[in-house]
Amino acid sequence: MGRRPFVDVTTAEKPDPQSAEEKQFSLSALDIKRLCPFFYAAICMIPRFYTDQVPGIRVTADKIFINRRYIGSLSRAELTGVIIHELYHILMSHNVRGAGKDPVRWNRACDLYISKCMNETFGTVPGKGSVSLSMPDMVKTYIGLPEGMPFDAGISVEKDIPEKIYLRHEIEEPEHEFNASSGDAGGAS
């Protein structure tokens, strides 16, 4: 069974409000507030830490770990999409539901489900640019998902769940993992 690397919480840094990456994160958080206030409330309540121990963004059941270089490589729309994607992992209790499962395969199944949820909710498709969303009396807001994030248009949000996707034989481990990977910081999903 695959294992995720351990994230040493004691060496991870709390956000510095003056840092470029935290300013970028805050702008995306404001976009999330415009798009979905529920997700904004969640992002405000979940502690986040910056660390080089993860390749992108990794979540546990109650924390977010962020690689500074990774978020610096994303557009604002992509970062907004990735943050929402990672919030889905936390809010759907994927960490807990994945206990006893292969963490890499479980994460991929969850990623596929989340990508389809985001496609149906916001119109996003990984690597296809950003989507402009606006509502009456609202600032136009953009959301996107970076190239390489798993997506399967055949997944049904109504009929599928990550557990069902996990059991499918055609869902195999990717050759390399997408950078914004979730999983338990202790190594077990």
Please place each PLM-identified region on the residue numbering:
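Short, functionally important secondary-structure microenvironments
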Residues: 1-81, 87-189
